[in-house]
Amino acid sequence: MVPAVNPPTTSNHVAVIGAGAAGLVAARELRREGHSVVVFERGNHIGGVWAYTPNVEPDPLSIDPTRPVIHSSLYSSLRTIIPQECMGFTDFPFSTRLENGSRDPRRHPGHSEVLAYLRDFVREFKIEEMIRFETEVVRVEQAGENPKKWRVKSRNFGDISDEIYDAVVVCNGHYTEPRHALIPGIDTWPGKQIHSHNYRVPEQVKDQVVVVIGSSVSGVDISRDIANVTKEVHISSRSTKPETYEKLPGYDNLWLHSNIETVREDGSVVFKNGKTVYADTIMHCTGYKYYFPFLDTKGEVTVEDNRVGPLYKHVFPPALSPGLSFIGLPWQVIPFPMFELQSKWVAAVLAGRVSLPSQEEMEDTKMFYLKLEASCIPKRYTHLMAELDSQFVYNNWLADQCDYPRIEKWREQMFYKVFKRIQSQASTYKDDWDDDHLIAEAYEDFVKFPSNYPSSLIEREYTS
């Protein structure tokens, strides 16, 4: 059911935490709805996880709570999993080519191109004027004297600010605080361990035997990245059958195994398939935790086994809505358009243009959790949208709430295509495709937005 869309009635003072892609589009949408916005960014630049740095944390596993935190988890060779046409916000196409050809022309561009796109976005919509750089949010809580207000404490080079806001939108990302595999015997295993958060270049493991834990797209991508400089790479996957043992095509030194059974003091790693290797390094490509160390909700919002909840539609905690919201929690999605639609919804709700259900109705989210449990789906997969159509059903629901056009069919079909290519041609999918007709449809749409994609380039690209 689509709610009634009303004229905006309220202008709020809103704090946005984080100047990555989610925070940037949230700031734009909030201001479009007439809100006053302050974006808090602890770094000195925009981009969040897309701002590459060669620096790594001193603790290679990123376990030490006192460590200096490096926000980005990018490695040097990383290219986008999703084609550039899909990546962009719906009204600001992802342009990777200037007239002089000075930018990355690949359909799956490198991470620096994504950061360049976000900088273009900031420039086009004058977002930088809303950002407080080098300002870390250290505490967010309801203002005691007025629970409908929010107290935000922030730190800038030792100076503490204490301010009151009408609403807080949390956009701090979830690719900074690593998750780790639990490995029997690891306390006495003599080799090195590293989380992929601290992986940058293959030379870090040159001439070594490496065991990579995790067979997700990023785990396999990193394994291929290091295979040319290592002696051997062994991928451990918990999603394969116990007897799994196979050499991956295109490499003489890259194997896929089932899960690790145990590791031993002599440096050996024993897999459930019975194979044993002597490894120098174990690399954890095991994902990340949702982490909000600044947020105090008196237990209304918790993170339990990587479930942030309870949240209505992954965004609003029923007991604290609409003053507190989260953008960007779902994963295995096309992120930027989803961030945009979530932000439109939050901005419209805060403006009074769109209404939320009652708290009781929103608490039906608990039934959703019970259904997951009944289906034996672990809590850590609450925000996973791995089923091919689930994210588009969700995106279209968000669009309907705001009376905004649904996600384009070409974008949806393009995502399906790339997903199939990943499964059938994992080593070549970024440079070999069969959906030129969808690219043409995308460029036809891009003509509507000439500010970021000159029409001369559009015509040349989809007709060449």
Swiss-Prot record:
SUPFAM superfamilies: FAD/NAD(P)-binding domain. GO terms for biological process: stomatal closure. Pfam families: FMO-like. Coiled coil: none annotated. Gene3D superfamilies: FAD/NAD(P)-binding domain. It is an enzyme of class 1 (oxidoreductase). NADP(+) binds at residues 214-219. Its EC number is 1.8.-.-. The keyword Membrane does not apply. FAD binds at residues 18-23. GO terms for molecular function: flavin adenine dinucleotide binding; guanylate cyclase activity; N,N-dimethylaniline monooxygenase activity; NADP binding; nitric oxide binding; oxygen binding. Keywords: FAD, Flavoprotein, Monooxygenase, NADP, Oxidoreductase. The keyword Lyase does not apply. Its cofactor is FAD. InterPro entries: FAD/NAD-bd_sf, Flavin_mOase, Flavin_mOase-like, FMO-like. Belongs to the FMO family. Catalyzes the conversion of methylthioalkyl glucosinolates of any chain length into methylsulfinylalkyl glucosinolates. This is Flavin-containing monooxygenase FMO GS-OX-like 7. It comes from Arabidopsis thaliana.
